[in-house]
Amino acid sequence: MQKTNRDYPFIHNNEIIEWDIKSANTSLMRYYGLQPDKVIDKLASMPKSQREISVGKLMRKDKDFAKSLEESFNKIIQEFMDTNNLTWDDIVSVKKDAVFVKNHGIQKSEFGAVHFIPKNQYKHVLLLPKYEIYISNEKTDVK
């Protein structure tokens, strides 16, 4: 579902919050029952880089699991949007494991094992053909 709302190429003086899924792979596996708890617990105990490599190996080994995990990202993003009554006008961009929301309060950020956390806050966004530039008072991020 990765998509950017290009209706507004420059957003100025708005509250834009990046809502990121914490430990996305393992939390989605747990929420949707994609792996046994024992496997998920083992993965969750690993450092992030090792966990990502291990999940990648699981996905290469089991194509059905890989497809289910990829679909789970779309499902949980849609659930987050529906539950919080977000329309496309409220969205700046949707990434694999994050939603950039402008000027809209979030009422529910936890869905079982899946936790959306406010990772970054910005005031301005410039959407270019190949880049998204997010600007706050403290920093500039290019996505």
Task: Label every PLM stretch briefly.
Residues 1-143:
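Conserved acidic
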